[in-house]
């Protein structure tokens, strides 16, 4: 402190101004620090307390906390009443949309909307649902529907996915196995099948009993059963109809018989491959509550047979397949695959073939082997034996007069045609080619193509002559035909293929194989060009025997030719002229015991083991 403190000469006022501590707080007296520092203050508060309802306050706070949690949980699902005020002010203004409406309604909201009957309604829910017309998202932008209509659309029984899920769940509950485990899927309702699995939900017991009698008239086999659950009943049918029916037809039939909506029906064809589906129907058929009609399908019998599922029975033998294709004379891969697959119901080896993972390679190899066997067998036959076999393969009755009448109509002496046919069949040099020449529609192709069909010959197309392999079919046939030869074709023969017309050995190139040398088979040609009348084909005239068809072939009013020749007609033709054609009689005198003793076998299994 300064020496002159308090002695400014102004009396005691200077002391007060100097020693005073300035503070602008008026609440310092009430400071809790100063109150606590006071030792004279009483620690007991004797002020009057205002009584309150603490329990009600606690409940209110708990309720608000719960509502906040529910609101956070449902914030994405609450409907907004935003358009209600606009609709009250101006309905026309409410119809105006700047942004396009959503295509699909928010399906997740339905969960909370439909559950509102049992759920606790929050004040926000009450505020939303108490609006005059809750908003509904629609594509057309029209006014929203009522709350009751919204609930009806949700709880509608015919709801597609909902009803199907309920029926599948009920089916699995009652029958243990799922409906998809015993059936396969047909995507189209138009696909025909004679076997169907039908599950009907909610059919009455009286109609179920009557339906068995009605459906048994349409089916060769029918198995029916009905089970009841607290959530509904389920009727199950395995129907094998007398004729194939589509799902649409079966649905209409069952819906009319059971008086059940189509939405409460499940229809799919049964799984016919697999042990589990077969055991399901077999076990269900043993139940006394199951009604059956007719004979059990073969696929159930076979797959529930112990011997049918043994390892030895399911072993595939390639030789058996080749033997089957050889016996049926099948040389096309598509026919071998299709026809052998159809035998899987009765042939165990065919069933094992379907279970194989390399069917394409097996079919290709089988086709190749059959072609090798048939080609070697055909080449080992004489022309007489070959024609005899073709006659045996021809079916039906025919008349050789249809061929003779066509020749006479064209002014050809039948005896001249037969005399030319005799060396042609034997492939005698200089007599190896016969040409039928004449104007269009004179029956040239009719005569030649029917003869090729009977003899199993090949047809060559000159359009492929630019390829080195266009003559490759000559290696697999006994006779051949070139239809409608033009000047280009005759010039090509005159330049390159004179020895083919002669009937001498030729070398033929084959694709992906080495060239083969063989005797040229007898050749038939049809043409509008007479090589004997043109000097530039002088070197072909001695190699070609020509017959002229000068008259147009008559036809009926419908355009059908009056001359009609079949394989049976050619069969009768060769049988009647067998000796005239100088064909040997060895086929009539052949040792029948040798032929009947054993046919050609290309399977490793013995004859008794083959199916």
Swiss-Prot record:
Q: What class of enzyme is it?
A: isomerase
Where is this chain compositionally biased, Low complexity type? 135-146
Main localization is host cell
List residues, modification Phosphoserine.
80, 84, 90
Decide whether keyword Manganese is in the record. Answer: no
Where in this protein does the record put region DNA-binding region?
A: 146-313
Post-translation: what modifications? Answer: Phosphorylated. Sumoylated.
Compartments where located: Host nucleus
Compositionally biased spans, kind Basic and acidic residues: 112-128
Short sequence motif Nuclear localization signal: positions: 74-76
Signal peptide (residue range): none
Chain residues that bind ATP: 438-445
Q: What does this protein do?
A: ATP-dependent DNA 3'-5' helicase required for initiation of viral DNA replication. It forms a complex with the viral E2 protein. The E1-E2 complex binds to the replication origin which contains binding sites for both proteins. During the initial step, a dimer of E1 interacts with a dimer of protein E2 leading to a complex that binds the viral origin of replication with high specificity. Then, a second dimer of E1 displaces the E2 dimer in an ATP-dependent manner to form the E1 tetramer.
The protein, known as:
Replication protein E1
Q: Which organism is it from?
A: European elk papillomavirus
Q: Gene symbol?
A: E1
């Amino acid at each position: 402190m300064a020496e002159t403190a308090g002695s400014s000469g102004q009396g005691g006022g200077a002391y007060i101004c100097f020693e005073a501590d300035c503070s602008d707080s008026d609440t310092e007296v009430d400071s809790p620090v100063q109150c606590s520092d006071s030792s004279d203050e009483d620690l007991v508060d004797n002020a009057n307390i205002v009584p309150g309802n603490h329990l009600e306050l606690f409940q209110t706070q708990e309720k608000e906390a719960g509502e906040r949690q529910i609101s956070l949980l449902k914030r994405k699902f609450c409907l907004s009443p935003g358009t209600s005020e606009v609709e009250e002010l101006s309905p026309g203004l409410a119809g105006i949309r700047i942004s396009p409406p959503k295509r699909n309604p928010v399906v997740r909201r339905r969960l909370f909307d439909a559950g509102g009957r049992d759920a606790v309604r929050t004040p926000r829910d009450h505020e939303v649902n108490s609006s005059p017309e809750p908003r509904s998202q629609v594509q057309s932008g029209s006014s929203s529907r009522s709350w009751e209509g919204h609930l009806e659309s949700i709880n509608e029984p015919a709801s597609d996915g909902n009803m199907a899920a309920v029926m599948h769940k009920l089916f699995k509950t009652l029958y243990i196995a799922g409906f998809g485990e015993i059936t396969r899927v047909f995507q189209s309702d138009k696909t025909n099948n004679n076997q169907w699995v039908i599950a009907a939900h909610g059919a009455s017991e009286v109609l179920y009993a009557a339906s068995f009698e009605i459906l048994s008239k349409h089916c060769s086999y029918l198995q029916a059963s009905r089970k009841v659950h607290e959530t509904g009943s389920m009727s199950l049918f395995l129907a094998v109809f007398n004729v194939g029916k589509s799902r649409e037809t079966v649905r209409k039939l069952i819906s009319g018989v059971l008086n059940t909506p189509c939405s409460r029906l499940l229809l799919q064809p049964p799984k016919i491959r697999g042990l589990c589906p077969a055991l399901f129907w077999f076990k269900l058929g043993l139940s006394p509550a199951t009604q059956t009609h007719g004979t059990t399908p073969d696929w159930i019998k076979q797959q529930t047979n112990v011997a049918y599922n043994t390892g030895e029975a399911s072993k595939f033998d390639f030789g058996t397949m080749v033997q089957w294709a050889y016996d049926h004379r099948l040389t096309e891969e598509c026919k071998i695959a299709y026809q052998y697959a159809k035998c899987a119901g009765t042939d165990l080896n065919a069933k094992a073939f379907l279970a194989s993972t390399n069917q394409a390679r097996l079919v290709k190899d089988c086709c190749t082997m059959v072609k090798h066997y048939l080609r070697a067998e055909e080449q080992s036959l004489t022309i007489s034996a070959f024609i005899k076999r073709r006659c045996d393969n021809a079916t039906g009755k025919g008349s050789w007069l249809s061929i003779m009448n066509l020749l006479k109509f064209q002014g050809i002496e039948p005896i001249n045609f037969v005399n030319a046919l005799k060396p042609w069949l034997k492939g005698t040099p200089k007599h190896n080619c016969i040409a039928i020449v004449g104007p269009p529609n004179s029956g040239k192709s009719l005569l030649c193509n029917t003869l090729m069909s009977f003899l199993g010959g090949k047809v060559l197309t000159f359009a492929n002559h630019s390829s080195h392999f266009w003559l490759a079919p000559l290696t697999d046939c006994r006779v051949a035909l070139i239809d409608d030869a033009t000047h280009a074709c005759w010039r090509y023969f005159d330049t390159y293929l004179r020895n083919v017309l002669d009937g001498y050995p030729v070398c033929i190139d084959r694709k992906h194989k080495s060239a083969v040398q063989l005797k040229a088979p007898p050749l038939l040609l049809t043409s509008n060009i007479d090589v004997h009348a043109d000097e530039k084909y002088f070197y072909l005239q001695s190699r070609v025997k020509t017959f002229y068809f000068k008259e147009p072939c008559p036809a009926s009013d419908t355009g059908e030719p009056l001359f009609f020749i079949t394989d049976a007609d050619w069969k009768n033709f060769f049988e009647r002229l067998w000796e005239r054609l100088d064909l040997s009689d060895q086929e009539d005198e052949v040792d029948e015991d040798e032929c009947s003793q054993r046919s050609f076998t290309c399977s490793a299994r013995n004859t008794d083991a083959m199916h």
